[in-house]
Amino acid sequence: MLDNLKKYKIVLGSQSPRRKELLSGLDIRFEQKAMPDIAEDYPAGLDREKVPLYLARMKAEAYRSKGMMQDSTLLITADTVVIIDGTILGKPQDREEAARMLRTLSGRTHQVVTGVCISHRWETRAFSCSSLVTFAHLSDEEIDYYLERYRPYDKAGSYGIQEWIGYIAIQRVEGSFYNVMGLPVHLLYNELKDFGESN
């Protein structure tokens, strides 16, 4: 599948092992490269649902500005945020913040939005995906166990849906499960397919 993309060098601009795993599931050849360091800042007035797409674009621009884009490069960048009560929960700085985030999510429904940017030297395509996730009530003991065993400090909202906490606490997901993991692969596949057919 996606034979039209074989002329491109597909690069996943992300250090995330979850995004690497998900992109691998599309059976396309790619390489994973760490992105240049960027401050994940965004304009204060920006709609919260638009933040991940803004950051995905920033990551692509950082890659481009370092002269890392060749004519054959097809770069995929992404960013995922958790939103609850109009507040973005990013990656926790420490255990205390992670526990606070999980207590906030406990017994409630929150939104997960992933923004994805596909960049070629002369073209950029961007899209986002939103899912709703409902948590069961989490006890302090369950939160402590999860943080001790899984240390989710590299994850937005302090949890990985594919981990232990997902098995015991996720009551419902409305929308893409893989979006919650960090990459809406069904949309990405269609965008890559369309890109290959039109270029």
From Swiss-Prot:
A Pfam family this chain is assigned to: Maf
GO molecular function term, any single one: UTP diphosphatase activity
Keyword Calcium among record annotations: no
Sites annotated Important for substrate specificity: R18, T80, Q162
Disulfide bridge positions per record: none
Keyword Transferase: no
Residues of the signal peptide: none
Cofactor: a divalent metal cation
InterPro entries: ITPase-like_fam, Maf-like
One Gene Ontology term from the biological process aspect of the record: nucleotide metabolic process
EC class of the enzyme, as a word: hydrolase
Enzyme nomenclature, EC number: 3.6.1.9
UniProt cross-references to SUPFAM superfamilies, sorted A to Z: ITPase-like (SSF52972)
Cellular component terms (Gene Ontology): cytoplasm
Subcellular location(s) of the protein: Cytoplasm
Catalysis performed (reactions): dTTP + H2O = dTMP + diphosphate + H(+); UTP + H2O = UMP + diphosphate + H(+)
Active site: D79
Keywords: Cytoplasm, Hydrolase, Nucleotide metabolism
Function: Nucleoside triphosphate pyrophosphatase that hydrolyzes dTTP and UTP. May have a dual role in cell division arrest and in preventing the incorporation of modified nucleotides into cellular nucleic acids.
Family the entry assigns: Belongs to the Maf family. YhdE subfamily.
Name the UniProt record assigns to this protein: dTTP/UTP pyrophosphatase
Organism: Porphyromonas gingivalis (strain ATCC BAA-308 / W83)
Gene this protein is translated from: maf
